């Protein structure tokens, strides 16, 4: 992975996986929760629809650096993004990223309890796994028969500046 290809790979993963664990630091320490990411790579922004009654606003007021973790266990891809966060009230943005499933929690994007969290990625760490599950199982079985170490390929960890 090189330069823009690195960032492109990060955005591809975020777009494909969608759900992440978002971690904030508040007055009572770290707090993580699953949220659905709404990435906008052209704006270098990951949007989240949140509830204004949650503790995220207070936590971001204490420390606006957040952590986002995306995992694809089947492909052995693990992505951690450090981002700067801000709470936003913008009905146009809420409407543009609104999905039908959001209606399970709110009465549309104009619901007064709908808030937006804007995450601007600063840097990302990507652990790109060596192989698919099938290859890993094959290599494990082969190593059990031959006694040799399994050939699982290269396990790469790369830190990418996202600014």
Task: Show the residue positions of the predicted features.
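Short active-site oxyanion
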Residues: 42-47
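Positively charged, polar, low-complexity stretches
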Residues: 30-34, 57
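A short, Trp-centered hydrophobic/proline-enriched beta-strand micro-motif
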Residues: 12-27, 66-70
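C-terminal edge-of-domain segments
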Residues: 112-163
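Short, structured beta-strand-loop surface elements
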Residues: 56-123
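A short, well-structured catalytic beta-strand-centered motif of the EAL phosphodiesterase domain
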Residues: 36-39
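Extreme N-terminal tail/first-helix region
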Residues: 1-21, 144-146, 156, 162-163
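Short His-Asn-centered micro-motif
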Residues: 49-51, 71
């Amino acid at each position: 992975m090189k330069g823009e290809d690195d960032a492109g790979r990060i955005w591809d993963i975020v777009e494909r996986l969608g759900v992440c664990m978002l971690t904030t630091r508040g007055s009572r320490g770290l707090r993580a929760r699953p949220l659905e990411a709404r990435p906008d790579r052209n704006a270098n922004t990951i949007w989240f629809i949140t509830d204004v009654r949650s503790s995220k606003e207070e936590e971001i007021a204490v420390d606006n650096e957040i952590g986002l973790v995306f995992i694809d266990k089947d492909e052995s891809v693990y992505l951690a993004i450090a981002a700067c966060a801000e709470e936003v009230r913008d009905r146009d943005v809420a409407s543009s990223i609104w999905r039908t499933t959001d209606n399970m929690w709110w009465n549309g994007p104009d619901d007064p309890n709908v808030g937006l969290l804007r995450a601007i990625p600063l840097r990302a760490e990507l652990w790109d796994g060596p192989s698919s599950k099938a290859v890993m199982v094959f290599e494990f079985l082969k190593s059990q028969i031959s006694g040799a170490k399994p050939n699982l390929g290269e396990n790469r960890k790369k830190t990418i500046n996202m600014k």
